[in-house]
Each structure stands twice: as C-alpha cells, then as structure tokens.
Amino acid sequence: MSQKIIYFFLSILFISNAFSITIDGDLSDDEWSNAETLEGFLTVFPDTLEKPKYKTEVKYFTDNKGIYFGITNYQPKSTQVIERHQRDSFYANADRNYVMIDFDNNASAGYEFTVTLGDSIRDSIFVDENEFSDNWDAIWYAKTKSY
C-alpha cells in the first residue's frame, strides 16, 4: 500500500525538550520514534463520523522552537491528489490535512493549519467558535512527501 506523509512545523514558542529535526517530509529523524501518536480518527468532512477508508496516524512533539506534527496517511498512490495552490486557498483541489489548536480549550480562539499534498498551506483563526478569518498568516513551515 502506498502512503503519503504530510508533515509540518508550527512556529509557536512552546518550551519542552531540545530537539533538532529537518523539515523535509521524512519522519525518520530520531525524535519521531519517541513522539506521541494519535490514531483512530473519524470522518468529519463530510460529517459522517464514520471510520475512514484509509488509516491516518499523527505524531507530535514539542521543543524550544515550536510544535511539530507528522501525519501519515495510508492511501493508495493512485487516489492521491497532488496539486499546488495559492496560499490560503480554501477550495484547493488536493488532498490535505488540517490541524486545529485551541490553546485555552474553551472555544474562545482556535487556530487552523492546513497543508496539501502539493505543499500548499493555509492558516486561519477562529474566534468565539464561529467567527473565521484567513487574513491571519502565521510563520510556519511544511513539507510533504508521497511514497
């Protein structure tokens, strides 16, 4: 089975251990072997809450430079849509992964970070659960790789 790895780094100051990785779409750096892992995702686009057809695995860790996410989508290469789009393009025709973060865990402010398999990025901010703006541009880096 082919897979695609969508990996990105959020440049948000968060103190923890001192790591050093290369942002290259490859999860072979030693830090990834000790990273926290999330699995068991459900489909939310469309909002069916069904188990997805293909497995997704998320790894994450922090260091003194930021928060790192490594996302592996186990998806046949023949079904992968690899297109590059303008930054913040919501209607991009490409496979993508979203990470949404609510640092206060109270729905007062949330941050969305999206990367497509073609390395296009999108970021936005949500305020009070439903006020949305994509005029907010964070400093962050992403690189994807398809196998």
What are these regions (language model features)?
Residues M1-I5:
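Positively charged n-region of N-terminal signal peptides that target proteins for export
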Residues Y7-N17:
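Bacterial N-terminal signal peptides
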Residues F19-Y147:
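Structural preference for beta-rich elements and adjacent junctions enriched in aromatics
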